[in-house]
Amino acid sequence: DIDFPGELSTPDIYRTMDDLKSFGVPVLILSGGEPLLHPDIFAISAHAKSMGFYVGLSTNGTMIDEAMLPKVAAIGYDYVGISLDGIEATHDRFRRKDGAFAASLRGVRLCRDAGIKVGMRFTLTQDNAHDLPALIALADEERIDKFYLSHLNYAGRGNKNRGSDAHF
């Protein structure tokens, strides 16, 4: 909903996908920011699927509700990864929004219950490392069989937060 300097137009995205396919790239992970905010995300996703890419969606999950779920399911994403930055208050603080954890978890559950291959994504920092065991337990309780653990990426807001990266 907000144009960013240098952001590709949808036709440019399609041309880039053509190039990636010609180079033999097998997988596209659509991420952001928040990819579900892009007005053409479902057209882009459908186009990628029609080209034979393995297509993943990396989202914060808050927009996946009962109204959005059929659109997500119709694409047939090979994988939907939903970011959880901690348990409840930790996640809400990271996302700067009260209720973000509940909304993200709702997205996980809706995808799971619809038969969409869904996983939890967790970026480890000093500020959320204490929640890692509880998140792994949550994934088990929710019958989510994929848990993706990553380090802080020093790009965008992550670069501003580089001091909070986990150090062991």
What are these regions (language model features)?
Residues D1-Y79:
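Conserved alpha-helical substructure of the radical SAM core
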Residues D3, L8, Y54, A74-I75, ...:
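Radical SAM enzyme [4Fe-4S]-AdoMet core and its adjacent flexible, acidic
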